[in-house]
Structure formats: C-alpha cells, structure tokens
Amino acid sequence: MNNKENDNVIIILPAKSEYVSTARLTASSVSTRAGFNIDEVEDIKVAVSEVCNMILSRTQNKISQYRISFDINTDNIKITFTAENTTLNCFEESIENEYGLYIMKALMDSVELCNEEHSIVMTKRIGV
C-alpha cells in the first residue's frame, strides 16, 4: 500500500442540497483509503452530511459554493469546510442546542465550529 501520510483531497461543491451526496461519496472513498473500518466510514459520512446541511441552511443562498478539504494523516483525518469569499460565521451560539451538532460531536473526535480561518473543522482518529 502507498504511503498515505499528508495526502489531501479537496472538492468544491455548489451550495445546493443535491450535492450533499457527492460530499458523502467523497468522504466514504477518502475515509476508506485512510484506513477507517466500515462503521467509522459511515460515521464520517453522517457527520459530513450534517455539516453540509448546516452550511446550506445557515448561509441561506448567500454563497454559491463551498469547499471541503480532507487531510489524511497517519493517525487521523481532518475535514475542513470553508465557504467561498466569505466566512462561515461562528455558528456556536446559534446551533448550540441543535441536534446535528450533537450528532457531529458524537461521531467525530473533535468538532470546531469557529476556528481562526472561520471554517468548520472535524477530526477523527484512525483505530480509536
């Protein structure tokens, strides 16, 4: 098997709900390649869907596309969501009690809703 350390896969999707399945399929492929088992891959797909849906519902047609970056490291995968020409405003307060946030936090090892780059970042460790 090839060395997967520091591989990076980036997709840019139209801000339309029809493309959430594309994000899920990409998450599945990248997570499998990174070495996650089938249950972990499913968890990652669900978490990615939740973030995509959150972005689409919270930005309310203010963006035309968003970017998802999958950073594969030897011991984890980091998934970063950013919007084009704008910031994904800190959703922390507005979704603190939202069910989707609980799902993301339950399925991933860490979830940052507002980092320095105004992105949404999720991390999952391999084999944990």
Task: Identify the residue ranges that each predicted region occupies.
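Generic alpha-helical hydrophobic packing signal
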Residues: 26, 30, 43, 47, ...
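Bergerat-fold GHKL ATPase/HATPase_c domain
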Residues: 1-46
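Conserved beta-strand-loop-beta-strand hairpin that lines the nucleotide-binding pocket
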Residues: 1-10, 54-128
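Conserved ATP-binding N-box helix of the HATPase_c
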Residues: 38-62
